Every structure is written in structure tokens, then in C-alpha cells.
UniProtKB/Swiss-Prot annotation:
Belongs to the peptidase M48B family. InterPro entries: HtpX_protease (IPR050083), Pept_M48_protease_HtpX (IPR022919), Peptidase_M48 (IPR001915). This is Protease HtpX homolog. Keywords: Cell membrane, Hydrolase, Membrane, Metal-binding, Metalloprotease, Protease, Transmembrane, Transmembrane helix, Zinc. It comes from Mycobacterium tuberculosis (strain ATCC 25618 / H37Rv). It is an enzyme of class 3 (hydrolase). Its EC number is 3.4.24.-. It holds the Pfam family Peptidase_M48.
Amino acid sequence: MTWHPHANRLKTFLLLVGMSALIVAVGALFGRTALMLAALFAVGMNVYVYFNSDKLALRAMHAQPVSELQAPAMYRIVRELATSAHQPMPRLYISDTAAPNAFATGRNPRNAAVCCTTGILRILNERELRAVLGHELSHVYNRDILISCVAGALAAVITALANMAMWAGMFGGNRDNANPFALLLVALLGPIAATVIRMAVSRSREYQADESGAVLTGDPLALASALRKISGGVQAAPLPPEPQLASQAHLMIANPFRAGERIGSLFSTHPPIEDRIRRLEAMARG
């Protein structure tokens, strides 16, 4: 099995550089003092995101670690797949929510965690669960998780800077040589840029993880079946449209929000389920 971590390491580096440059540039718009503070903040943000990417997603989903006694099937499947891929065993978590979904997080295979919701464990059979876990492990082995978390952090920073720019433009844009027109531009374009970044990074990752996961398990049709069930299950039991969950939606195997909800459409980071299923069925046909 061939993994593709090197290209994603480069993308991660470029995103971190871009996030730092953006923070410093927006700091300059607020004036000299803000520029110095922004530079310090950029360094701190990079360090924090790198070492805490796993904790952010697990905390947002209220995920709890589980032992092999608590989740024997999950442990058995993950151990078999990790051994087959010659990779370390990740930490396993369960999130007690009816919303059917799963995600992986962590900056590298040795610091990875895989989480399933109780909802997905309830609706999938073991063959389908194996396919979903293979998909999530593929994210880990391809180093998708770090780039995804960095992209999410970058999007969050852009949104925060846009909010700061809006308030600064309203209540003090002329102090310390701040440029009110530039602040207004940041406020208007920031949320759009944040959404585009999430979508651009996440959609291509999902197709690749579908393919890599199907090769790892040798069963693309099982993943197609799982995606059908998850898609239907999300319509019946979506995650609540809360900002902290929306910021982690790009990590999930499928969009966790009900179709048509404002937050679900705004933060849609996944390719259409129908397209993913068609690709998997074509893969099964050879």
C-alpha cells in the first residue's frame, strides 16, 4: 500500500506560512503596535495548532477514550488494519451522539486518534464499520489530518480577523495609522476566504481517503454502503448547528449537518455523497 504524506507536509508548511503572513499583514492594517502583537500571535498560533490539533476536535465532539473491553469490534478492526498497513495503533474514542459519523485527528500516525459516534456504531454492520475505519486510517497515513486541522485553524483565524476588522473600522479605524478601507475589505472577504479554504482542502482529501481506504480494506462496496447509511442517518439525526462543531465538520467522513440548514450549506466541506459512491462502485468494477 502506497501512502502520500510528503505532498501534504508541503501543503501544511505553506498553510502555516500563509497563516503567519496573513496575521502579520492584518496586524499591520491596525497599526505598528498591532503588527508586533500579530507577529507574536502568529508564532504562538502555529505552535498551538501543531501540538493540539487532536484535542480540539475531540473536545468539540465530547469524545471519550474507550478500552478494548468497551469497544472490542472497533479495536479488533483498527488493529488488523494498522498491522496490515505497518502503522502504529491509534487511540480510539467514542462520542455519545446519535448523529452517525466518524473522524480521525492528530498530527501524525504516532499521535493519531480515531473517533466513532454511537450513532454510526448503531447503524453500520461490521463490514461497513471496517470500511469507515479504513477510510479514517487512510487520512492518518496520508497526513491529511494535520493539513486539515491547520486549514481549519487558518479559516478560524481569518474569521476572527474579519470580526476584528469590522469592529475596528466601526470604533477606531483611524487610530495608530490604521487603514479603514483595508479593514472593511478584510471584514467583507474574510468569511468567504475561510469557507473556500475549508472546501478546497477537504473535498480532495475525501476522494483520496475513499480510494486509499477501499484499497486498505479491499472492499469499496462496503464503504459505498456505509456512506449511503450515514447520509440517510444524518438527515434523521444531524449534529446541532453550533459554531464549535461547524469548525470541525471538515474532519468528518460525511457532512454532519442536515441538507438545507444554513450552517450545513455554508460550511459544506465534503463532495456529494452520490459522487463518492459512484467512484467507489466504479472502483469495485475495476
